[in-house]
From Swiss-Prot:
Spans traversing the lipid bilayer: 7-29
Regions annotated as coiled coil: none
Lineage: Eukaryota, Sar, Stramenopiles, Ochrophyta, Bacillariophyta
Gene: psaM
Protein name: Photosystem I reaction center subunit XII
Intracellular or extracellular location(s): Plastid, Chloroplast thylakoid membrane
Alphabetized UniProt keyword annotations: Chloroplast, Membrane, Photosynthesis, Photosystem I, Plastid, Thylakoid, Transmembrane, Transmembrane helix
GO terms of biological process kind: photosynthesis
Record organism: Phaeodactylum tricornutum (strain CCAP 1055/1)
Amino acid sequence: MIYDSQIYTVLCIALLAGILAIRLGSTLYE
């Protein structure tokens, strides 16, 4: 059984990881 809090936590981590990846990529390409 997956709780809403776990889903919310996973989504937040994925969002932060995506933002960090985009910022890192843009920094490398500059």
